[in-house]
Amino acid sequence: MGHATGECTVTESPGQKGARLMTAGHCLATAAERQAAVAAASRGDLGPAVLLPGSHLTVWHTGSQAWVFGDGAGVVPVYWREHEGGVWWATAATPLAALTGAPPDLAWLLADLTLTGVDFRLQIAQFKGVRRVPPGSALVFRDHAVPDVVRLPAGPRSTLGKGARRLRDVLTTAVTRRALAAERVTTDLSGGVDSSSVTCLAVAQKPVLAVTYTDARMAGDDDLLFARRIAAEVGGITHRVIDARDAQAKHFDGLEDPDALPTTDLPSMSLGVLPMLAARLAPAAACGSGAHLTGRGGDNVLAAPSSHRVDAFLAGRRLQAFRRATDFARVCRIEPWRAWRQLAATTATPYPRALQRLADQLADPLPATWRPAPIDALAWCSATAAASWLTPAGRRAISQLVSSRVPHAGGHTAPGALHDRLDLEWMAGEHATFDAIARQLWGVPIHAPFLDTAVAAACLSIPPFERARPGVYKPLARVALAQLVPDWLLTRQTKTLFTTSVFDGLAANAPALRRIIAGSRLAAAGLLDARQAAADLESGIAGAPAPLGALHALLVAELWLTRLTTAATHTAWWQPAPQGSIPCP
């Protein structure tokens, strides 16, 4: 949805009548690469089409069949539904829901708030009756039958060295072609490895305006120091530092009037930081940036989830797994035996059984003082802090949803690889909503090269336990980006936290946030206890320990539900065709 004519390209097959490849979105492929993909697809090999550079929708039409798929991360998703004797599909779920007035799926929303390690999305969308095509799969139309969802070809597993060489090539392509395609290019320059690497690759092609955001809490941390050093030592960078104190922006500002907020297809964490994003993107908007490049997704593909230790054990690297579990316990400040016990339990438990245990756990009331434990990161699946807000009806809904995933879970044999994919899909959705908001409000297109299909595939082809090294931050980046970015950047060992800034925002915006929780639609549906959520909110407002991530997610979920009253109506998306509605092929 929403792709301009210039973002859509069609390539015909010279040897197969009626066969053509169409892409919509940020496809960075050359004419030669597209022709090679068409030739391979004509022979039955969709691999080259899947890995065309960029992040986009692809439709391969043979005349008798049509294969429709988004990117491998989920930035450009595909949704579909049956209606009026036909099949309708789109790259957004909201218009398909508006077609029939389908309501949001509140169990889906609860799952998004309360579960980790559960693939509850799979083929389920955020609206009832709307189905989702999982990233890495295609919606396949044959004649007039109901379409099939078919897995697309995936590449082989790689070693760190081989994957790093591939990453070096595809990431350079992803950034370089974006930089060359836009007249004016801007970048995020947080000072971290990810955004700094993207900035360095972009400025190798043309001068860029790089923006660093800071505030009173972050000004003395390493991010700003590294960003300034990058700007000073790498030629071609015009550096702007945006200080929240000057911009008068805090977390959760601007939420007093939900009807004035931008609409998104999914709940978006960006709604909780809108004025901060506005300040950060103001220089890009002012200069007419045609592409604002970010490092989003870098943490997902360059690093590894905590559960990589379990994958190492399952791959036969048992001593390595226990040593890394000991390191994990030290960082979490817990006894090593607790991490060892969870490691052993996870390796001994198949994923379907772990799901059923979680479903059984959620069916019963949680203790009043319950909070997720650090060792949950080593489990297949677990509940988040938001699970403590569920009512009996909410617990039943989530328990049933988790149980429904059990029959589909047998193919997963390693939790680290599963968490890699789920975390990547979540970040892809977040990026897509951020991009939609930035285009709506400030006219700035946001790019995340690390989320491109080819880039993510190169990284995730390496087992997660290979992408982690004790005492080495993002070892994959060190190997892949050597001599492309300054060596001292790749040896950075610190990461700035934003916790204190979040507390400041909660306190400053307490009245508006209290109103959002008090008017909770999930609570009105009997699924969530607003009093318990409000108690955690009050703790955060007072600067006491609180589940900040869960509160942020709940607030934006409630805002999303509020906006749907006008954003998901039929008239907002559809108008009658002169001769009646025409279903998509």
PLM features per residue range, with description:
Residues 1-248, 526:
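Cysteine-centered catalytic environments shared across enzyme families
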Residues 14-22, 26-42, 63, 374-421, ...:
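Glycine/proline-rich, flexible active-site/cofactor-binding loop segments
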Residues 43, 47, 99-108, 410-423, ...:
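Structural motif
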Residues 64-67, 75, 155-393, 438-484, ...:
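ATP-dependent adenylate-handling active sites, centered on carboxylate activation for C-N bond formation
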Residues 91, 106-107, 114-115, 469-491:
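Charge-dense polyanion-binding interfaces
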Residues 110-118, 275-282, 422-433, 549-566:
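Short, hydrophobic/amphipathic alpha-helical patches that form generic packing surfaces
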Residues 306, 484-544:
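PAPS-dependent sulfotransferase catalytic core
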Residues 519-585:
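Acidic, carboxylate-rich catalytic segments that either coordinate divalent cations
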